[in-house]
Amino acid sequence: MRKPFYKILYVQVLFAICIGILLGHFWPDTGVAMKPLGDGFIKLIKMIIGPIIFCTVVTGIAGMSDMKKVGRVGGKALLYFEVVSTFALLIGLGAAHLLKPGVGFNIDPATLDTKAIAQYVSKAHGQSTVEFLMHIIPDTVFSAFANGDILQILLVSLFFGAALAVLGERARIVVQLIEQVSKVFFHIVHVITKVAPIGAFGAMAFTIGKYGLGSLVPLLKLIGTFYFTAIVFVLVVLGTIARMTGFSIVRFIAYIKEELLIVLGTSSSEAALPHMMEKLEKLGCSKSVVGLVVPTGYSFNLDGTNIYMTMAVIFIAQATGIELTLMQQLTILAVAMITSKGASGVTGSGFITLAATLAVVPTIPVAGMVLILGIDRFMSECRALTNIIGNGVATVVVSAWERELDRKRLARVLQHGAGDDADTLGEAGQRAA
């Protein structure tokens, strides 16, 4: 029996976003006061991300007969991430040169007040490659979960799952226990998801109330250029990759519409991570690939953030009248390829990553970030949407490379829209096992 339209989650979230926009615009003070609703929802999701990643990765790896497969899946995922991320950086750079969103501002960097961006610049210091890699290793097993660091949790999960796989039948009872615990946490996800409209309403009301629609006007060309470029990237680059893998990017986007609306409302791709992992399993991807690729992608495969970084750098250069040589632009690309790996799927991380990039590229003044601070929240929504679509496509592609993609199920789900709330994770788990 079909649900009434007003009971469908994505309809509720879309309605909540619209109400949030209206409240924030006409009653900004009240809109700003709604911030705890959005923050509370994101904290609820973050509360269970660690256990879900742990359970999914551990049960997936423990079920592998060949431990070499873990390294093979990880290697293929990182190769894909690097190639597609480089494409995203180049496309952002090219679009900024082609559409020139910063030309005509003629701003003297010395006149800019950098107090507003001081907190971002301070957070960006010290993000070297070595420190980033060392940070992946937690101080203790429990500190990884206490800090909620996705990569640290993933590392612990990899070791734990590999140990269970080596122990084999002797650890079977532990694997079965973790599988049952996983079902409990995914049930919690479904409960939390029911309040997603409230979270989306609060986050959107705060964004519009604090920054106002009027803050968009002076920089509409930059916003339009970024959104247009992101759409082209998704439809052309990711669309081509999807078509080569055997599915339609448009149908895939329609399939994850609920997750996209949650991301749109909260500006955080992390808010949809647990539900996204579940959806990808239902789509036909194996549990082991989903568990490895999705969490890793939240630091290594942020396509929207990559497009934003190179575009923002060129925008600041254009707005301040700085001419960049080819070598300087190649340097920016090289630096961005490293600093982008330190980003995560949370609100504002893209701006911090931009600060880290500019901090090691002295040609362009860090003070120029002031120009886009007011609109970053609106850019964050597009970054997060592009990121989550990119990670979803990456998971399907790696599953196909590993021959662990149920293509019949993939075609059936995308064709008929199966796998929504009526499906259960248990069914997906039985198929993956």
Swiss-Prot record:
Membrane-related topology note: Multi-pass membrane protein
Where is it mainly found? membrane
Q: Which domain of life is it from?
A: Bacteria
Q: Which GO terms describe its cellular component?
A: plasma membrane
Say if the entry is tagged with keyword Cell membrane.
Answer: yes
The UniProt entry, under InterPro entries, shows: C4_dicarb_transport, Na-dicarboxylate_symporter, Na-dicarboxylate_symporter_CS, Na:dicarbo_symporter_sf
GO terms (BP aspect): L-aspartate transmembrane transport
Q: Which one of the record's GO molecular function terms can you name?
A: succinate transmembrane transporter activity
Output the PROSITE patterns linked to this UniProt entry. NA_DICARBOXYL_SYMP_1, NA_DICARBOXYL_SYMP_2
**Its biological purpose:** Responsible for the transport of dicarboxylates such as succinate, fumarate, and malate from the periplasm across the membrane.
NCBIfam families, A to Z: PRK01663.1, PRK13027.1
Family that this chain belongs to:
Belongs to the dicarboxylate/amino acid:cation symporter (DAACS) (TC 2.A.23) family.
List, alphabetically, the PANTHER family matched: AEROBIC C4-DICARBOXYLATE TRANSPORT PROTEIN, PROTON/GLUTAMATE-ASPARTATE SYMPORTER
Query: What is the name listed in the Swiss-Prot or TrEMBL entry for this protein?
Result: C4-dicarboxylate transport protein
